[in-house]
Amino acid sequence: MENDDPQKLMPEPRIFVERTLALIKPDAIHKTDEIEDIILQSGFTILQKRRLQLSPEQCSDFYAEHYGKLHFPHLTAFMSSGPVVALALARDQAIATWKAIMGPVSSIKARETHPDCLRARFGTCDLRNAVHGSETFSAAEREIRFMFPHSVIEPIPMGEAAKDYLSRFINPTLLVGLTELCKIKPEDPYTWLADWLMNNNPNKPKVLDGAAVEEAA
């Protein structure tokens, strides 16, 4: 049947993953669990998490783009006044989505215009506004490296590079799996396909005498 054509079962896969940095500031540290729940319910994956106490010098480096502004001394003093929680987040349109969840910079304005956002719920003013988020893709990359200096941030395939990656490494295996799915017609196709992909991952290491060994190149 035409509907059984595996190539027509789903649209062409695309890569949308984006990363951003979220900071839970000292004034909202007691709300960490609640904020993390909101993050996860919003479709984010928490790639890394770290609780730390920043020094005034570290705060100055992190907020270097604010240097020379009137609020800069107050910002660095506040951010070094207590522990913060740094979170490396990932999902499609992560930067824009996290900014929307945070709401306006001013918690006072946020309570008037976006009463359900994090800054309206957990912040008190422009300075003590509960959370921070990366403004741009380049800022996210820099801030994640700042908070997680030992992490390796692989470049995300985009545009033609993403299409090439999918056509070379993903689509061939996926097409075989979908073909088998159409033949077998399991009761739970999603679970069946997930298990099939796990068992037929071409990059899965071979196991020999209890030890995992990679195939020779």
Swiss-Prot record:
Keywords: Cell projection, Developmental protein, Hydrolase. It is an enzyme of class 3 (hydrolase). GO terms for biological process: cilium movement; CTP biosynthetic process; GTP biosynthetic process; negative regulation of oxidative stress-induced intrinsic apoptotic signaling pathway; UTP biosynthetic process. Its EC number is 3.1.-.-. GO terms for cellular component: cilium. Residues 18-151 are annotated as: NDK. CDD domains: DD_NDKH5-like, NDPk5. PROSITE patterns: NDPK_LIKE. Its main location: other. InterPro entries: Dpy-30_motif, NDK-like_dom, NDK-like_dom_sf, Nucleoside_diP_kinase. Disruption phenotype: Morpholino knockdown of the gene in embryos results in ciliopathic phenotypes, including a ventrally curved trunk, small eyes, otolith defects, hydrocephalus, and reversed heart looping. In the spine of mutant animals, the cilia of the central canal form normally and there are no changes in the length or number of cilia, indicating that the gene is not required for ciliary development. However, the beating movement of motile cilia is rarely observed in mutant animals. It is found in: Cell projection, Cilium. It comes from the Eukaryota. GO terms for molecular function: 3'-5' exonuclease activity; nucleoside diphosphate kinase activity. The keyword Hydrolase applies. Functions as part of axonemal radial spoke complexes that play an important part in the motility of sperm and cilia. Does not seem to have nucleoside diphosphate kinase (NDPK) activity. Exhibits a 3'-5' exonuclease activity with a preference for single-stranded DNA, suggesting roles in DNA proofreading and repair. Belongs to the NDK family. Does not possess all residues considered to be crucial for the NDPK activity. This is Nucleoside diphosphate kinase homolog 5. It comes from Danio rerio (Zebrafish). The gene is nme5.
